[in-house]
Amino acid sequence: MIVRLGYVAMSMQVSNASPSKTMTAASFDKLNNRAAAVRKLERIAIENIHNTLRLLKHNRAHDIELYRCSSKLIPLRGHEMLNDWNPMEVLTEAFAELGGYAIKNAMRLSFHPDHFTVLSTPRADVLANSLADLDSHVAMLEAMGLDESAKCNIHVGGMYGDKQAASQRFIERFKALPERIRNRMTLENDDKTFTASETLEVCEITNTPMVLDIHHHEVNHEEELADCTVLWPRILQTWKGQTEQGTQLELPPKIHVSSPKSEKDARSHADFIDPGPLLTFLRSIAPLTPRVDVMIEAKKKDDALFQLMKEITEESDLEVLSQASFKL
């Protein structure tokens, strides 16, 4: 099994390269010249996209082919003060350059919309904002020229006093999404509400790939399903038919990995990854899985990736393939 590692949004090694620079709504509102204020937002967005390109070049130098883009590339995107603003007109060239670089270097990019993007909500206003947010994320992927292998990952959401009703709301609304959005979605188990098995059921009903978060599973699972590997054959099936950018090669399933910050704070993410639980999981799924992509959700970002690779070199049964991939 070939394993590729990736990280989320920020690099600890590339200085002055934040892809999430912003302007507060209060600061925007204080600017008397609205046109000038909008131009400032657009300049910040272009800088964020340019910094993302810098990060991709850093990734290429270190053989990192898996990367999650910041959801904050466009500041104040979706804010009620800017309902008449279409930033994509100005950002087309910058996004095209970013996506072109990713395609040229066979990089797998994704988004993970923020926690307020929930389709299971009982509130109409939250739902409307969630739908707009998903549309915006997909529009960015489209502007990059990326096909449907570039995904947006979300959770099923809260249970709002009735988990079954919340799940049903999610399913109905998910099925009603425009095809261009629905085909780019993946669903992930969360750390408090919807377990891996419950999320998998929703994925099977909606025909959507599942991203298994093994840390979330550790802190949120049914007693009889403590070992998430029993779900893996079904999770693999949710990825059937998914192909890599511009090819007919099967898109590898993706998992998330993080380590608990402490015993008392088991849900929060630590700075680095404890390789033990990850390698135990990977060894157990290897016979069924030709390739898997692992997104590292650690506070130290790419430093955590490099540290994990360093520890992997000490494992006798693992073959290092690159600075960010290995075989077992």
Q: Over which residues does each language-model region extend?
A:
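Alpha/beta catalytic barrel-like cores
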Residues: 1-108, 117-131, 135-146, 176, ...
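Glycine-rich, often proline-containing surface loops adjacent to acidic residues and nearby aromatics
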Residues: 108-117, 149-155
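Conserved, mostly hydrophobic/aromatic
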Residues: 112, 213, 294
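Eukaryote-skewed repeat-based solenoidal scaffolds used as protein-protein interaction platforms
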Residues: 134-206, 215
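Short active-site loop/helix that positions an aromatic residue
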Residues: 218-222
